[in-house]
Design a protein with these regions (language model features):
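Conserved phosphate-binding elements of NTP-dependent enzyme cores
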Residues: 1-942
């Protein structure tokens, strides 16, 4: 078997026809500056080719659904294994996905509960026993005399198929009717069912009217129905249109409540047989939030306290004013009174309506005047009704801004119906177990006491559960709960979950390609992750890891450094070999940082701040334990702590959202805290995250930074443009006039392929240049507008050197390390780190007020150590202007450069949520109880 993967002539994106040799069955780390071409080689070339070859081996029928995959721009690749990509972009946003379902641990838990669970009565909590035929008959005969019923046998429950044989057998056995999916059919009819839909079929065994003399006939019918289904009988009350379900298997003797036989689907919130009927298994509902309806309680109704669309403009004589005048008159309040001073009952009536009580509405319209008498439904009820009734997506989005996710009133956020939650294993229902952390669940499995018979049934299931929980703990995710929604996980967490799932699969001979698995991981947990990667390698797999973490580089068997620069300055193999060989290579920037020849310096002094501070009092979101936290203003503050310690809850959920509501008028629901003091010292909060700067190819760095407006003004001021009468709008590719109309200024045409992905092809008219011929004839210094958009930032700085307004904005893009990016590069092609730096550059180019607080969550994601150096210089510049920067970070190079640290912990999940220590990096390094301090001490001593 070949012992290496050989790549010849890779040219994807910025790769310069490179040849690479990768040893098989080794841990290979790919390094280099951000934008140097690592992902182009790892994902766009090696993974894409591995995937394409696998898809080609499938049948034409399977390929029809997967689509034709393009061959990457490479001469050939030898020795390639089936490739599995574990990146950070495929986090599921489906609200039905949880940590438990993604890892498949929940499937094993459902099986455990179905096989050894003890059912209880959902009403009284008593353990449920099997129900006899006599008990079923007694309950049916207790119905009021004259009740019309039909006894039915549910032979099929929620199964896909046409089920033609079921109908034939029933007809042959002499049955006349069947209820299919809630509708009654004669069996003489031709009943056609959709093959790929789930159906429920109930054979009507008998129809009866409740009388004392029907006992024998009812007994025969119930026994027949029970015999057809293995113990399950449905009695349908015809007039009331409701069903009574009886089971010979489980029923409460006191309440007469029976539940069906325990099956795994009964514990699935993604199946109608297990899901809560109110929220259909989501655990939450969208409800109008009064806090978002009235964000500023100091305003009066007349001043615009109410921010719901349709109710926020009452200065005229419209319908909303008519209602408010009537409410004020009836309940004796003034529209000029601040909302917070209105009596509680008045506020409740305005929000939730008058019930049946009618208002006296005086109208004065051009058509006439008069009085109407009608009730007021309340603003919350009005918004909710409009949300349900509207067909417009835009209206729905607007109304959703006034709504928040609230726990389902029926299941209290537990997702399952009450019958499913009444089944226990080891005195716990399945929801209670999934709300425990992975570490606690492992202890629960070890302590679980079962009978000998239950052990015989459950041992194999428990072994699978225990091993998968162990894998999660081994990748540093012991603080997570299985009930945690997959959409709330960070990129690093979701990647490590999929990594744990892959270890559980125990495949060998596979090529795994990972994208920065250490993201979001504290240094303490890094060793666990490395041990996991080495374990995966030792199974007989090749691991190709794109990484910037020094510990991972040192642990590698082989390292490939791509560079030397980024973008057009990268795309070459600078060094390849063992980490020691890369360190010895003078051309490798990565090697210089790894060997310590280059390093990010520790600041000589720490800023004390401007004497003012922001205080979060009583922070209690998620696992935070009513802590008080002080953020000194005018400093560079970093919030640290192990994964799951509460950093994001404190900074993103409480601090950012609360400041956003107060300063930016954002419509969000801040995390729980008593109050925040010191907001008056700030005038703006800016969250600089790694989300895209735009969702379409029309958005690019030039448009986002505002640079493109200046460039269009410049072209409009040229002599040629003036003589033709062209204004700045002529040079926009978003409006008619100067753009190419064949592609509407996109430069590409989208061809819809229906069930295949859409294909983009260059526009044949403008050849991808976006503008029409006349517009491109206008030139500045020999370049037209399309040429300028094709320039890199470095080239543009030189080109626009005599124009300070344009040059300064371009210089800020250079300062954040984006000199290699093209001005017109579509935002969809920028990485998360690049998008974040475009936002930083935009903020840098604004005039500083000195009263802004910037919040960044792990800004070093995707950044090389040299890029981190540039990022730190930019952040320090923001603080030098009098602003405050608050960063969540694990990167020790960032932590050591902070003015002030807030270390949360000591552990993750339930073991976290408290302040371990605060102070300068030197003070935290001296704190023995701080895990961050222990690692920081080593870095500061270098």
């Amino acid at each position: 078997m070949q012992d290496k993967i050989i790549v010849k002539g890779a040219r994807a994106n910025n790769l310069k026809n490179i040849d690479v040799t990768i040893p098989r069955d080794k841990l290979v780390v790919m390094t280099g500056l951000s934008g140097s071409g690592k992902s182009s080689l790892a994902f766009d070339t090696i993974y894409a080719e591995g995937q394409r070859r696998y898809v080609e081996s499938l049948s034409s029928y399977a390929r029809m659904f997967l689509g034709q995959m393009d061959k990457p721009d490479v001469d050939y690749i030898e020795g390639l294994s089936p490739a599995i990509s574990i990146d950070q972009k495929t986090t599921s946003k489906n609200p039905r996905s949880t940590v438990g379902t993604v890892t498949e641990i929940y499937d094993y838990l459902r099986l455990l509960w179905a096989r050894v669970g003890t059912p209880h009565c959902p009403k009284c909590g008593k353990e449920i026993r099997q129900q006899t035929i006599d008990q079923i008959i007694d309950q049916v005969l207790s119905l009021p005399e004259g009740t019309r019923i039909q006894v039915m046998a549910p032979v099929i429950r929620g199964k896909k198929g046409e089920h033609a044989k079921i109908f034939e057998d029933a007809k042959r056995s002499g049955y006349v009717r069947a209820r299919v999916d809630g509708n009654l059919y004669e069996l003489d009819e031709e009943i056609k069912l959709e093959k790929n839909k789930k159906h429920t079929i109930e054979i009507v065994v008998d129809r009866l009217i409740i009388r004392p003399d029907i006992q024998q006939r009812l007994t025969d019918s119930v026994e027949t129905a029970s015999g057809l289904t293995g113990g399950l009988v449905v009695v349908n009350l015809l007039r009331e249109e409701r069903d009574l379900t009886f089971s010979q298997n489980y029923a409460c003797e006191d309440c007469g409540i029976s539940i069906e036989e325990l099956t795994p689907r009964m514990f699935s919130f993604n199946n109608p047989f297990g899901a809560c009927p109110t929220c259909t298994g989501l655990g939450s509902q969208l409800k109008v939030d009064p806090e978002l309806i009235v964000p500023d309680k100091s305003l009066s109704i007349l001043e615009g306290a109410i921010q719901a669309s349709g109710w926020n403009n009452i200065r005229g004589d419209g319908i909303s004013r008519m209602y408010f005048d009537a409410l004020a008159k009836k309940y004796h309040f003034s529209l000029t009174d601040p909302w917070e001073t209105l009596p509680e009952d008045v506020r409740s009536i305005i929000l939730y309506g008058t019930g049946g009580e009618k208002l006296e509405l005086h109208y004065d319209q051009p058509r006439g005047k008069g009085v109407l008498y009608q009730p007021f439904e309340g603003i919350c009820n009005n918004v909710e009704r409009r949300y349900k009734e509207t067909q417009s997506d835009a209206s729905k989005r607007e109304l959703e801004e006034l709504m928040a996710e609230c726990p389902c009133p029926t299941c209290k956020g537990k997702r399952l119906k009450k019958e499913s939650l009444a089944v226990t294993v080891g005195d716990k229902d399945i929801d209670a177990l999934t709300r425990m952390s992975v570490v606690d669940e492992l202890q629960w499995v070890d302590r679980l006491e079962l009978t000998h018979q239950q052990h015989l049934i459950a041992d194999r299931i428990l072994k699978e559960i225990k091993s998968r929980l162990g894998f999660l703990q081994s990748v540093g995710l012991g603080y997570l709960t299985l009930s945690r929604s997959a959409g709330t996980l960070s990129g690093g967490e979701s990647q490590r979950i999929r990594l744990a799932t892959q270890i559980g699969s125990s495949l060998m001979g596979v090529l795994y390609i990972l994208d920065e698995p250490s993201i979001g991981l504290h240094q303490r947990d890094n060793d666990k992750l490395l041990a996991t990667l080495q374990n995966l390698r030792d199974l007989g797999n090749t691991l190709l890891v794109v990484e910037h973490d020094e510990d991972t580089m040192r642990a590698a068997d082989y390292q490939i450094d791509i560079g030397p620069g980024a973008g057009i300055h990268g795309g070459e193999v600078v060094a390849a070999g063992t980490p020691e060989e890369v360190m010895a290579n003078p051309n490798s920037l990565t090697g210089q940082y790894l060997s310590g020849k280059k390093r990010i310096p520790v600041p000589e002094t720490r800023r004390p701040g401007n004497g003012k501070s922001l205080k979060v009092i009583g922070a209690a979101e998620n696992n935070l334990r009513h802590i008080d936290v002080e953020f000194p203003l005018g400093t560079f503050t970093v919030v640290t702590g192990v994964s799951g310690s509460g950093k994001s809850s404190l900074v993103n959920e409480i601090l950012f959202k609360k400041l956003g509501v107060e300063l930016n008028r954002m419509k969000v629901h801040p995390g729980r805290c008593d109050r925040i003091e010191g907001i008056e010292y700030l005038d703006k909060v800016v969250d600089i995250d790694q989300s895209p700067i735009g969702r379409t190819p029309r958005s690019n760095p030039a448009t986002y930074t505002g640079l493109f407006n200046d460039i269009r003004d410049l072209f409009a001021s040229t002599q040629e443009a003036k003589s033709r009468g062209y204004g700045p709008g002529r040079f926009s590719f978003n409006v008619r006039g100067g753009r190419c109309e064949a592609c509407s200024g996109d430069g590409v045409l989208k061809i819809e392929m229906h069930f295949l992905p859409d294909i983009f092809v260059p526009c044949e008219v403008c050849k991808g240049r976006r503008y029409n011929r006349e517009t491109l004839e206008v030139r500045y210094k020999g370049k037209n507008i399309a040429d300028v958009l094709e320039m890199t930032v470095d080239e543009a700085v030189e080109f626009f050197a005599p124009l300070p307004r344009i040059r300064n904005k371009l210089q800020t893009l250079c300062d954040v390390g984006l000199g290699y990016v093209k001005l017109g590069q579509p935002s969809t092609e920028l990485s998360g780190g690049e998008a974040q730096r475009v936002k930083l550059a935009t903020e840098l180019s604004k005039i500083a007020t000195g009263k802004t607080i910037y919040i960044l969550d792990e800004p070093t994601t995707g950044l090389h150590t040299d890029d981190v150096r540039k990022l730190l210089e930019v952040l320090q510049r923001l603080v030098d202007s009098g602003n405050t920067v608050v960063v969540i970070e694990h990167n020790l190079d960032v932590i050591k450069c902070a003015d002030h640290l807030i270390d949360l912990g000591p552990e993750g999940g339930d073991g976290g949520g408290t302040i371990v220590c605060t102070g300068t990096p030197e003070e935290v390094a001296a704190c023995r109880s701080s895990f961050t301090g222990q690692y920081l001490k080593k870095v500061l001593e270098k």
